[in-house]
């Protein structure tokens, strides 16, 4: 079909789903992750990728949204998810055997129009059927990249039409022999880089200690690509073990940044009260 934008279709504000982090929502420029789009969240191990996605699922469920989690890594922890505010009993969970099965389930969920958010954890774990059925040591060059490219070609139209948010979690690999620039790359070929409207790079920058015990991570998120707002903004926040994003700490940090809260030494004051 072809249509003319003659004013009959009013430009509406973009539908978004909050990430559960005020700083990341601000860095995204639209107040959250855009619906009807593909989002990629990548970073090193234990940097908070799955935590950020579970926080977003919890926020989506709070507004009455229906969410699905495709656990290709077979590492979903319902106890931890519940601690982050996820209503596990209302979450659709799939643990597929192959990459083809995972992406077929994702496509079916999106086409149904009955799901608001789908998370795929992770692209690196989407193993092609041929690789699973083959022998250890067999070479399967480019199979995963081809699988992702084909799946995204099919998915994007359905995602836009049903206004579903699809988040792909991805891992980092090192390119061999890179002399200049970053040797880091994400798995699954280049297709996801092109199809994603938002790409978030999440990193652990330090530890949070209480005495000698480490109780959390200092985390930095960089918006590497953004088709819905200006890119390259950053957000810093704390992830506390067993609790998720430290909302209170983030509120104070943003208060200081925007001169709402005054900081002098180790003291914070708001309207004169410390």
Swiss-Prot record:
GO biological process, one term: SOS response
Keyword DNA damage: yes
A molecular function (GO) term: ATP binding
Annotated ATP binding sites: 43-50
PROSITE patterns assigned: RECA_1 (PS00321), RECA_2 (PS50162), RECA_3 (PS50163)
Record key words, sorted: ATP-binding, Cytoplasm, DNA damage, DNA recombination, DNA repair, DNA-binding, Nucleotide-binding, SOS response
Keyword DNA-binding (UniProt): yes
Gene Ontology annotations for the cellular component aspect, listed alphabetically: cytosol
Compartment(s) where it occurs, according to its Swiss-Prot or TrEMBL record: Cytoplasm
Family the UniProt entry places it in: Belongs to the RecA family.
Function in brief: Can catalyze the hydrolysis of ATP in the presence of single-stranded DNA, the ATP-dependent uptake of single-stranded DNA by duplex DNA, and the ATP-dependent hybridization of homologous single-stranded DNAs. It interacts with LexA causing its activation and leading to its autocatalytic cleavage.
Name of the protein in question: Protein RecA
Organism expressing this protein natively: Neisseria pharyngis
Lineage: Bacteria, Pseudomonadati, Pseudomonadota, Betaproteobacteria, Neisseriales
């Amino acid at each position: 079909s072809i249509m003319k934008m003659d004013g009959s279709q009013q430009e509406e504000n973009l539908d978004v789903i909050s990430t559960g982090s005020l700083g990341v929502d601000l860095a995204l420029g639209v107040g959250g992750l855009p619906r009807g789009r593909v989002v990629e969240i990548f970073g090193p191990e234990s940097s908070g990728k799955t935590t950020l996605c579970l926080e977003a699922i919890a926020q989506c469920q709070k507004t009455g949204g229906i969410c699905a989690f495709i656990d290709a890594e077979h590492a979903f922890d319902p106890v931890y998810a519940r601690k982050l505010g996820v209503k596990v009993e209302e979450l659709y969970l799939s643990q597929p055997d192959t990459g083809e099965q995972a992406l077929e389930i994702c496509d079916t969920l999106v086409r149904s129009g009955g799901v608001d958010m789908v998370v795929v954890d992770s692209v690196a774990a989407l193993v092609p059927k041929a690789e699973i059925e083959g022998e250890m040591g067999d070479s399967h060059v480019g199979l995963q990249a081809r699988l992702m490219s084909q799946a995204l070609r099919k998915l994007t139209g359905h995602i836009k039409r049903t206004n579903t948010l699809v988040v792909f979690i991805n891992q980092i690999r090192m390119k061999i022999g890179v002399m200049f620039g970053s040797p880091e790359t994400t798995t699954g070929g280049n297709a996801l880089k092109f199809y994603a409207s938002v790409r978030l790079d999440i990193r652990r920058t330090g530890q949070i200690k209480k005495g000698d015990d480490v109780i959390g991570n200092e985390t930095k998120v960089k918006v590497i690509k953004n088709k819905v707002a200006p890119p390259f903004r950053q957000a810093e926040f704390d992830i506390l073990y067993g609790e998720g994003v430290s909302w209170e700490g983030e509120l104070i940090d943003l208060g200081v940044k925007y001169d709402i809260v005054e900081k002098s030494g180790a003291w914070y004051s708001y309207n004169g009260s410390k």
